[in-house]
């Protein structure tokens, strides 16, 4: 029924059972009779009846820019604004996992907000290299060293995003749908 869910997992099976209970209660007790009847007759489709009894959301746009720029709270712990691209990518995947475990359906994340963290990494690398080699190396060599480290961090950050999103599992046994 849902290709993002592994039906062999107990958490997925529990989610499916809860969904059937929710559909039944939604049909018998929560929806007006004419809506339930129209759904049964195929006149309309009442979407997400399997989650209707719960106060959770279907799909959202995560305000990742605000959460990264101003910090956020996850699991009762304050997460400060990242100081590098790699950390921003890691925090982004943690936010995606937390949101996915507390809703159903997909989520959208605007990755453009990660750009400023690449700039932070650039500035950090440049400062480190200038402090260590500033008067011993020409500026173009310093820039080349900074770019080499920056490209490695960019690659590692994107790899983190890909691996984490593809291997994370939510509480209902589903991979985040991003």
Regions found by a protein language model. Name each.
Residues 1-178:
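Catalytic alpha/beta active-site cores
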């Amino acid at each position: 029924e849902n290709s993002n869910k592994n039906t062999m997992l107990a958490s997925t099976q529990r989610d499916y059972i809860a969904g059937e209970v929710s559909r039944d209660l939604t049909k018998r007790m929560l929806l007006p009779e004419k809506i339930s009847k129209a759904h049964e007759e195929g006149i309309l489709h009442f979407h997400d009846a399997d989650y209707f009894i719960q106060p959770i959301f279907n799909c959202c746009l995560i305000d990742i820019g605000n959460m990264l720029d101003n910090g956020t709270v996850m699991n009762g712990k304050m997460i400060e604004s990242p100081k590098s691209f790699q950390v921003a990518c890691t925090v982004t995947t943690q936010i995606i996992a937390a949101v996915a475990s507390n809703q159903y359906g997909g989520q959208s994340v605007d990755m453009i907000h990660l750009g400023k963290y690449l700039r932070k990494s650039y500035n950090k690398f440049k400062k480190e290299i200038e402090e260590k080699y500033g008067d011993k190396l020409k500026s173009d060599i310093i820039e080349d060293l900074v770019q080499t480290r920056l490209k490695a961090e960019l690659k590692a950050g994107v790899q983190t995003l890909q691996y984490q999103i593809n291997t994370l599992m939510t509480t209902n046994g589903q991979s985040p749908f991003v």
